């Protein structure tokens, strides 16, 4: 199948915003006006096309990025709708890799809200050009110019209004296009499909003139030849201004600003024009870079059908009909259905069964996909972040970095017979979502699920019930403590049992000492056969078993060296089990004498916060037994680096949200284990013995 749309006419865009700024409604309108849907879906009715998971329809929020292709004036738009809730930030990060441009949707009343700020920073990190759409202009308190000031102040960016609103609140009728100085008016309720160009209302001429001047000044500052014309007093044609604004937008010097009300069907078509006019095609962005797995050398792939095939799997989903769907962005070359590709970061081959072009949860089968495009593959065993490429020209693209899960809770099936099913379902969710992790607590043997927040885990539990008919019980969050020793100690372990018939006899002497290099080391110093060779591994096994449960609070023991140096045996009664028990007894006794302590995980925490909340955030980290390591200022944002015990970090996402009105974000990674202060260790031991009583 030959290429349907030239690569220059492709636009891979994300629609990003804070929760409730009207992003999904905006996407619905785009699909309606581009002819992809015949009936407009309303989010508050649970009918939106892009919100296709059951939980999304109920909650009215977008959880997974649905992707869809739409067509406008001969251009193909691949649109990714992303969630605005902080617990699902991973979806935004994940889709940034596949995008070339973003439409940031801001609510006209609230302006720049927390998650938009966080997502703006991610877009900065990934270097994605963007335009701004101020939505909900029909609401009471709508203030387009207020959002303009907000963007400058909170995002430290350079917004350029290319429209001004006509009216506001109930009287919002349309916009003035500042390039050709015409009013665009939506009259009547033709679902917004019809609009007229008129002369600018008399009362708005001065305002429009003032903002047109500001727009021209901002644009010519980025282009020397236009600046010369401007200062010479020449009239600059609208086309030249647009061309210069396109270049400045792609270079991330300026952000074109538009407005409308998606719900009332006004302002969407000019915004689609702006996507085409100002956001980049795959050819306009820098080539993607990666490493050749054979040589380790850096290589680049340009957006061209003639280069070797290279793509990134940016999302994996289980589909009720097709099995696993792997969404991928093609950076170079092309791939056909039925072709075998190389998953270079895993060194394995995969056959692409079918290729689908997605429209929310509907699909169209295509035979080939080319450079710059986005599609979904059926039958490929891949995970998020995998590189798919041509085996003859291998490349591994930069790994996707995801924030670490910050909350964990115990989970078990309501019926024992569902244990196997639970394991399968958890594995499936881990494949789909890189921020969802599963572990087993060796102490309690409980399965723990880890995620980005309570809503994240709630939705996973809900999906188990709905999609897999799996009922589970969940517990409260918990910390994985460990124990160790601070000094050397010696102890004897003697196990003798005489009870008719053959007895049991095992006798050992051991030294234990702190060992920072290894979690556990066993040294055999037996000489002269005082303990026969065949019983020595049993002593080691007995010590290991005893280390599963320390003497402070019953947590696993780490960083210990044990030396077996003496003992005795009985010709008839000695056995492996007797020496294993003797080893365990000796270890427990030695540990009590070796100054045992409780250890807790210390986390490295980085908080990105607007400057005005810096003092409150630092005060809060100090109250959590945190140590502040330093601070870094970036624009209006401060990054605070600290080390904080994990035990103090439960509920932090929620607390940080309330301290900073949700405008701060944080990333937490494990640093090391450290001794717990004595008074806290006593509390932990007390709670542990109560729980196990």
From Swiss-Prot:
Residue positions binding GTP: 17-24, 81-85, 135-138
Cell compartment(s), UniProt: Cytoplasm
Disulfide partners: none
Subcellular location, principal: cytoplasm
GO BP, one annotated term: ribosome disassembly
Entry-linked NCBIfam families: EF-G, PRK12740.1-3, PRK12740.1-5, PRK13351.1-1, small_GTP
Name of this chain's protein: Elongation factor G
Organism from which the protein derives: Sulfurihydrogenibium sp. (strain YO3AOP1)
Lineage, uppermost ranks: Bacteria, Pseudomonadati, Aquificota, Aquificia, Aquificales
Gene behind this protein: fusA
């Amino acid at each position: 199948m030959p290429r349907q749309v030239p690569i220059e006419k492709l636009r891979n865009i994300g629609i990003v915003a804070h929760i409730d700024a009207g992003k999904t409604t905006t996407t619905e309108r785009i699909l309606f006006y581009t002819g992809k849907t015949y009936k407009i879906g309303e989010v508050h009715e649970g009918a939106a096309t892009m919100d296709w998971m059951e939980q999304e329809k109920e909650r009215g929020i977008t959880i997974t990025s649905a992707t869809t292709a739409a067509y406008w004036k001969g251009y193909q738009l691949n649109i990714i709708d992303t969630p605005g809730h902080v617990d699902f930030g991973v979806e935004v990060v994940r889709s940034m890799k596949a995008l070339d441009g973003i439409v940031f949707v801001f609510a006209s009343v609230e302006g720049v809200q927390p998650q938009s700020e966080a997502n703006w920073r991610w877009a900065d990190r990934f270097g994605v050009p963007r335009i701004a759409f101020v939505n909900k202009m029909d609401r009471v308190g709508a203030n387009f110019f207020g959002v303009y000031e907000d963007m400058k102040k909170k995002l430290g960016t350079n917004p350029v209004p290319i429209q001004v609103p006509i009216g506001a609140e109930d009287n919002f009728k349309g916009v003035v296009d500042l390039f050709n100085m015409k009013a665009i008016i939506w009259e009547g309720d033709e679902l917004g499909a019809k609009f007229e160009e008129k002369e600018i209302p008399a009362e708005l001429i001065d305002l429009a003139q003032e903002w047109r001047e500001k727009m021209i000044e901002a644009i010519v500052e980025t282009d020397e030849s236009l600046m010369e014309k401007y200062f010479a007093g020449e009239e600059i044609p609208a086309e030249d201004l647009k061309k210069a604004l396109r270049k400045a937008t792609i270079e991330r010097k300026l952000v074109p600003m538009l407005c409308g009300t998606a719900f009332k069907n006004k302002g969407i078509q000019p915004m689609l024009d702006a996507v085409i006019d100002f956001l980049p095609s795959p050819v306009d962005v820098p080539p993607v870079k990666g490493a050749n797995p054979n040589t380790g050398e850096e290589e680049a792939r340009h957006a061209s059908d003639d280069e070797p095939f290279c793509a990134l799997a940016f999302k994996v989903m289980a589909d009720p009909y097709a099995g696993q769907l792997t969404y991928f962005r093609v950076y170079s070359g092309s791939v056909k259905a039925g072709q075998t590709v190389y998953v270079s970061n895993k060194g394995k081959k995969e056959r692409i069964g079918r290729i689908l072009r997605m429209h929310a949860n509907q699909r169209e089968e295509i035979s080939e996909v080319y450079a710059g495009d986005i599609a979904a593959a059926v039958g490929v065993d891949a995970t998020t972040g995998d590189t798919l490429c041509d085996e003859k020209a291998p490349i591994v693209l930069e790994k996707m970095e995801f924030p670490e899960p910050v909350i964990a809770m115990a989970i078990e099936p309501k019926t024992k017979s569902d244990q196997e099913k639970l394991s399968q379902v958890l594995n499936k969710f881990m494949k789909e979502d890189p921020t969802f992790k599963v572990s087993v607590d060796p102490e309690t043997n409980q399965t723990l699920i880890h995620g980005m927040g309570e809503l994240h885990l709630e939705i996973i539990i809900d999906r188990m019930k709905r999609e897999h008919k799996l009922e589970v019980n969940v517990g409260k969050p918990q910390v994985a403590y460990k124990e160790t020793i601070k000094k050397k100690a010696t102890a004897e372990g003697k196990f003798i049992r005489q009870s008719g018939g053959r007895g049991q006899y095992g006798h050992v002497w051991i030294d234990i000492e702190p060992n920072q290099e290894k979690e556990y080391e066993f040294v055999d110093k037996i000489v002269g056969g005082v303990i026969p060779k065949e019983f020595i591994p049993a002593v080691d096994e007995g010590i290991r078993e005893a280390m599963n449960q320390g003497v402070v609070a019953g947590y696993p023991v780490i960083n210990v060296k044990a030396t077996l140096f003496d003992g005795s045996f009985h010709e008839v009664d000695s056995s492996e089990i007797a020496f294993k028990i003797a080893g365990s007894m000796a270890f427990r006794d030695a540990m009590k004498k070796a100054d045992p302590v409780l250890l807790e995980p210390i986390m490295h925490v980085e908080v990105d916060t607007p400057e005005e909340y810096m003092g409150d955030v630092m005060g809060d980290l100090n109250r959590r037994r945190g140590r502040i390591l330093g601070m870094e200022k970036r624009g209006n944002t401060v990054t605070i680096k600290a080390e904080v015990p994990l035990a103090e970090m439960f509920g932090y996402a929620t607390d940080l949200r309330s301290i900073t009105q949700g405008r701060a974000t944080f990333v937490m990674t494990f640093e090391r284990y450290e001794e717990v202060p004595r008074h806290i260790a006593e509390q932990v031991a007390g709670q542990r013995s109560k729980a196990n009583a």
